[in-house]
Amino acid sequence: MEERYYPVIFPDERNFRPFTSDSLAAIEKRIAIQKERKKSKDKAAAEPQPRPQLDLKASRKLPKLYGDIPPELVAKPLEDLDPFYKDHKTFMVLNKKRTIYRFSAKRALFILGPFNPLRSLMIRISVHSVFSMFIICTVIINCMFMANSMERSFDNDIPEYVFIGIYILEAVIKILARGFIVDEFSFLRDPWNWLDFIVIGTAIATCFPGSQVNLSALRTFRVFRALKAISVISGLKVIVGALLRSVKKLVDVMVLTLFCLSIFALVGQQLFMGILNQKCIKHNCGPNPASNKDCFEKEKDSEDFIMCGTWLGSRPCPNGSTCDKTTLNPDNNYTKFDNFGWSFLAMFRVMTQDSWERLYRQILRTSGIYFVFFFVVVIFLGSFYLLNLTLAVVTMAYEEQNRNVAAETEAKEKMFQEAQQLLREEKEALVAMGIDRSSLNSLQASSFSPKKRKFFGSKTRKSFFMRGSKTAQASASDSEDDASKNPQLLEQTKRLSQNLPVDLFDEHVDPLHRQRALSAVSILTITMQEQEKFQEPCFPCGKNLASKYLVWDCSPQWLCIKKVLRTIMTDPFTELAITICIIINTVFLAVEHHNMDDNLKTILKIGNWVFTGIFIAEMCLKIIALDPYHYFRHGWNVFDSIVALLSLADVLYNTLSDNNRSFLASLRVLRVFKLAKSWPTLNTLIKIIGHSVGALGNLTVVLTIVVFIFSVVGMRLFGTKFNKTAYATQERPRRRWHMDNFYHSFLVVFRILCGEWIENMWGCMQDMDGSPLCIIVFVLIMVIGKLVVLNLFIALLLNSFSNEEKDGSLEGETRKTKVQLALDRFRRAFSFMLHALQSFCCKKCRRKNSPKPKETTESFAGENKDSILPDARPWKEYDTDMALYTGQAGAPLAPLAEVEDDVEYCGEGGALPTSQHSAGVQAGDLPPETKQLTSPDDQGVEMEVFSEEDLHLSIQSPRKKSDAVSMLSECSTIDLNDIFRNLQKTVSPKKQPDRCFPKGLSCHFLCHKTDKRKSPWVLWWNIRKTCYQIVKHSWFESFIIFVILLSSGALIFEDVNLPSRPQVEKLLRCTDNIFTFIFLLEMILKWVAFGFRRYFTSAWCWLDFLIVVVSVLSLMNLPSLKSFRTLRALRPLRALSQFEGMKVVVYALISAIPAILNVLLVCLIFWLVFCILGVNLFSGKFGRCINGTDINMYLDFTEVPNRSQCNISNYSWKVPQVNFDNVGNAYLALLQVATYKGWLEIMNAAVDSREKDEQPDFEANLYAYLYFVVFIIFGSFFTLNLFIGVIIDNFNQQQKKLGGQDIFMTEEQKKYYNAMKKLGTKKPQKPIPRPLNKCQAFVFDLVTSQVFDVIILGLIVLNMIIMMAESADQPKDVKKTFDILNIAFVVIFTIECLIKVFALRQHYFTNGWNLFDCVVVVLSIISTLVSRLEDSDISFPPTLFRVVRLARIGRILRLVRAARGIRTLLFALMMSLPSLFNIGLLLFLVMFIYAIFGMSWFSKVKKGSGIDDIFNFETFTGSMLCLFQITTSAGWDTLLNPMLEAKEHCNSSSQDSCQQPQIAVVYFVSYIIISFLIVVNMYIAVILENFNTATEESEDPLGEDDFEIFYEVWEKFDPEASQFIQYSALSDFADALPEPLRVAKPNKFQFLVMDLPMVMGDRLHCMDVLFAFTTRVLGDSSGLDTMKTMMEEKFMEANPFKKLYEPIVTTTKRKEEEQGAAVIQRAYRKHMEKMVKLRLKDRSSSSHQVFCNGDLSSLDVAKVKVHND
């Protein structure tokens, strides 16, 4: 029977045994035996239960290993191949496609047995692939019907009944085949079938005409039929599984997000309740002005009402109106904080950054500008941190799944390798069994190709059967190690060979064993054959056909032509010429614009013909040179040929039809992609998109299904009311965004996926009469679509990027593009010419300056033969100098120190003098290109030195220079400054100045020669030393920082109001002069102290120098230098060189700049394609005719059809500032689309456009939306996420480069080190003593009990709920009740505070949480008192004090100890804070500089669009408010629009100060790139990195909390905090600990193994116990002893009194001593007994003599205890 448990794998039909009644009886017998074993609880007989095998799971394909399925057994019940199901009443069925299905062997529906003919028929139907395809087709057709049909009619119902019938039939077939619910593998046991069940149930309910259910709601369930596609396609199931896993992992993030959102919502509710309905009401406006819209003042050129406030910093009302509360809130009464629900929705909107700038502006106008800090917290903590944690979690979930898949693939590859090795091993064993070796050889020879045979022949390993011998074990150790790392591999290997005999020496070999051994070999043979077959590129017949017709070898003359052409076409210069043609052609394409003159059109037309001819010629010549067979095997050649043929078709079409506008003309832009061949980064981007699209195939289908479902759900639920004609007004006759049909519904869902959901939701609620269903559906689309699916997309993209980056970097080191090779040729030719010229000039110089060249040469040769003039020799001559700098090849010596010469002197003619101190040429005198740094790992990487210090390092052979250059590729993010900074630390700091000028300068110019020992120079040297000491002094640095801050602060006051304050203006001019002179003086001091050489070789000093030059130039009041005053805004940049935190971030940014610029260029090229396409599609079509009196009144196209008619009718023809009239404008338009700001106006104009200079019509060009959809997917999604990829990748590279300590530790050591690091900071604390006073003691017991804490927590939650229940429009009675409850809570928490102080006495104030509670109570009392006062009595809003009550909620945080996941997230935030603070500082600096520039350039811009009284560039505050808003790219289009209006939007009095629109575009685009794309992405990178670290830490076996709990338990056993407990108490202590440190009783023996040290009095120290318990959890490892000693030393430093307690014994030694004592006692007792017996024998016969009768009690032997204290 045991033989049947683990069936042998045969490579043929013997694997497949039909499932018969005997099979069922055998299963029942096995189940009975299993039950008997369980009853008898026979542990010896119990076996570990096998797991289901992954490759044999249901719905997977049967592995090829099992051979082909016999035709007669297809779709028939078979015995299960998986050993796991040996005692389950199941059988398996395989279809023709080898898909595995499992069924229960019990009766289906209690009627149909496994052998029933009807059930067998149903099984055959349900497993057939045609049945699955039929269901998929039905689902697709049904989806198409759902997307098209809207109204219910008889015609629509007929197909619905057909579909329902098909689904019911499918369910019936499956139920008859599987059973309904009771048994294993029955219909409802599969969760995917639950979906079918619900769909059918709802469909039947909707079919009955008399049913009372809501049919339209139930009909929306039909749409979930689309999910049936997932249940049929196995690949989709995997992706959905990954999605569900990521959702599981997101639980902690979601809980934390909801908690933070609730806090923000409560804060918002308390702060802004009833404030957003404040508006400017006109004076004397009727009886009820608060509810009359006509009484409200409106914004200029807008339908919005003016919002105002009465507090400091809020917006005042214009003359003729007053600020008062009304009944109307903004955005159709949907934006408000009047209750918790609306407040929560508003905060969710801010967190998702959807139209948040609108809410931000509304709050600041009504409440005051100081509430900007509330938004800073919500945006940075909520939006940036929590939403990016979602990204981090999803990325980790995806990567984890990816690792598992990779591990499985690796396991299979290893299995093939094992197979290759096993084949050879089995030969000897099979021969020993009596199998002919020749037959085996013939089998192998016939089965494998020569390549494989060679591979097999090269391996010599011991036989698989010789496991007993040591040699066999040794040889197999490697593979066993590999296998042990992967249990799946081990399992599969076992399955291959589990029943092979182990005993080789058994003479009577079982024939079955021999058969098994043979089958194992044949399986491996078949497997290898299949693998080879799989790896073959194409069929042999195809290859023959191709070589016959597609390889042209006609004649020798033809071959000569081919050879010449091949040489020409594959030459790098040809590739360079083609690339130049592509670039020129791209320029030609980009030059096209609206209203071109005829000459330019002709030039572009001819150019197009020429380039088409060139590309066609290139294609033809390459085909001739390479043959079609080889030409079309390369992807780029195929692409080139497609582009060339399309261009040719375009030219022919234009020539024949005289129509210059065709779709083919738009396809010319594909030529731009030809650049990717010679541009590696563009190539990488295209590869990433290609790989991602390939890998994302299944995910794209899932996303499509999700979008389809939501589109149809929206259409079904809201389509009747939420349509284009709902709420029609004169201003907005038709709605653009609605769900009237599938196309518009899809666009709404797509817009939500782009992040814009709130405006659509308002429209839906307005049309659906405020239905909450709108909120539910739209938030669901946002959460499911945006947060989960798109984040998985991003995770995949980042993963593709990092993989591609790895591949690309490896290729980049070895291969160059042909264009690079061609450029290298030019570079070499130029270098050769330059060198020849240099040599020629130097020869002439030497002849003039050297009258005795022979003697000079001889003298040089005598002293140092290699000291030739460095500039005059070629590279080769430096090879001979290697002996001077390196002891041997590749082994660098210590750096050569600079010779401390007192004399800066050179020999005649610039030759260097030789000295007894110098050995050879000094490194400082070599040309700059030879100053190179040998990498510390001795790999021959060379880099040019450009550090500040004189680091003269060893030189390597310059022959490797080209290799080094290629390694430092354009994508390299190596920060050389970091390396040099690390090296500089090793060099002792100089205490005196460097030389003033470079040596080369001193040698060639006599005026620069100085001698420190001679009189004029001694004074100079002393002055320099004094200056050096001054600039190096810490006070000097502090003073300069102070001056920088003051000078930056002074710039704030230079705003638009300065001319009206002459005193301030005068003071600022004076301070500006002082600051300039201070900076000038500092620069001169540094020149004198450091010398020009050192000063001008530092990048920071250059920055200081340029800023000082700008400051000096701005002092000269020359008209031509007026613009330099603006550049003083760069002055705060000096702070960068002074603050270390910002320096670190800047270094990280600088190191990423090459990669960022590369990606930026690639994005520009990628966008150029869409720009050119946009210009072709929309140029000249955005203009429209308007009625000049009303800017918003667009005229109908039936009245004014075109521009000429508009001009005739005296109307105005208006073209939007952002359009597609040329490529420059197109770039700006696409940036607005990519950032989703101002994109709706652009899309509306595109969709309404008809033809050039024609009046647009509503949605005349409806499918223009698709252009923007495609651009957003490829241009925005892929390219902008590439920025995140680059920066994260750069951060990872930097960490690898700098994080050295972990490299030298094993995984066990790392875990131990982390644990030690955590516990090293902890020590036991003395518990608070219980008071002696009875009353105090009672209160003490009360406040320290757990019940008290739970009650207080309950009260906090109750208080939070009551605060949530408050609303703005609540009745007075309810308000009064809430006030009383609030006072009651304040009283309760005050009493809690007082009784704690009473019970805990002074110890109360030693706990941080208690202090926090105390502060909250005091503030609550103050806020309660303040809120009683009237608003008029105080000058600040009392709402500010009501917020203080919310701080009480913070106490809940101390009770979330059980929520480990949330703690991890908060820990990640804490770890991120230092880095985030530095990034925040840098962002503030950027904002500060841009604010100053903004004040200089845009202070006179007329108000309009996004520029108003509060948000403007007139003052520093207004500028910072605007810049904070556009840090998230929000609303930057509204700030830019007024500035694009150039002169007409300037104030008439200040035309001179009005800037060009181009400056505004550069200003905003550069700020968005710097802040939004770079700094914010650095923020994301830090969070991702720290989240990974925090997750790793949380997954450590021991965390901070484990150590804290250890010490909490310790306090109970050590109330005096002596750090010692008695050995007798150790057992109870160890048992009282929680897992994983707990050592459960009985634990005495485990303490002996731990060998714990004890001190006098049998006491144990806490650290010794903790070390031992930690080692027990982590496991002992080599190398931990050193670390343990190190950590003990660290602890002893922190706790010096431990040194007084030196351990005198250990638990093990004590046990040994006790055992020794017991042995001695026993021996002594035996000795005494023997002595007594002897004495009794020899005793005299005298009767009065008495002895002890053998009773040893009087000797107290048993009580003797040996103490060795």
From Swiss-Prot:
A single GO molecular function term of this UniProt record: voltage-gated sodium channel activity
Gene Ontology BP term (one): reflex
Q: Which cysteines are joined by disulfide bonds?
A: C280-C317, C764-C774
Activity regulation field? Activity is not sensitive to inhibition by tetrodotoxin.
I repeats span 115-403
Q: Which residues lie on this side of the membrane: Cytoplasmic?
A: 1-126, 178-189, 237-252, 398-567, 627-634, 683-697, 799-1029, 1093-1098, 1140-1158, 1289-1341, 1401-1406, 1464-1478, 1585-1765
> How does the record classify its membrane topology?
Multi-pass membrane protein
IV repeat start-end pairs: 1328-1619
Q: III repeats: which residues?
A: 1022-1319
Return the II repeat spans. Answer: 554-820
- List the record's Gene Ontology CC terms alphabetically: axon; axonal growth cone; C-fiber; cell body; glutamatergic synapse; neuronal cell body; plasma membrane; presynaptic membrane
Q: Which residues lie within the membrane without crossing it?
A: 340-364, 742-762, 1224-1245, 1516-1538
Q: Where in the cell?
A: Cell membrane
Where would you say this protein principally sits, based on its record? membrane
Query: What interactions and quaternary structure are annotated?
Result: The voltage-resistant sodium channel consists of an ion conducting pore forming alpha-subunit regulated by one or more auxiliary subunits SCN1B, SCN2B and SCN3B.
Task: Supply the name of the protein.
Answer: Sodium channel protein type 11 subunit alpha
- Native organism: Rattus norvegicus (Rat)
Name of the encoding gene: Scn11a
